[in-house]
Amino acid sequence: MAATSAEIEIFTGLPAPAPPRPRVLLVGAALASGSVAMVLGTLVAIYARLRSDVIAGGDAWVPEGGVIQLTSGNMGMVTLIMSAVTVAWFVYSLRNDDRPHAYLAAGLSILLGVAYIPTVVYGWQQLGLGAADTPQALMIFAITGLHVALVGVGLLFLAVMGFRALGGQLTGRAAEGANAAALFWYVTVALYAVVWYAITIVK
């Protein structure tokens, strides 16, 4: 009986564990998403201002020999929209402990994200201008190149969360990592919508 009392005293004397920090990864992803949105938004604003100045001077924005293809931009937009749907499916499946569908959704999301990159590369090839040829080409390459880099980061984020889900670390309401990856991906898709409209549609 004395031993039992001593054990109770020993265990009750231990310090309480540190409280868990809720949603740290989600908040970090939100801050990172906001930062990249400001950077890319600034570049698009500079692009729009330069375009307005050139057109106001009576010149064409796209110089002779340059072509901005609608096909590549539109395909890129459609591909990313589909990937946003599959990312939402990934998060939904994890929250409902539907692991087979979560793995399928993660794989499809990564596949669609990778498929977006060749559409941008094709647009660069069809542009007919090098990055150093004109200020217009430099801005187009800078904006679209930065967005491809963001997609690469988003794909890496999704891949890491997919492997964590495969290892059983993301389950039910504890799937904060999947929510964080999805948030970053949604912002990336929304940013491409801005880029697509400013460069491909408005030209």
Model-predicted regions and their roles:
Residues 1-203:
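...captures the hydrophobic TM-helix bundle architecture rather than a specific catalytic motif
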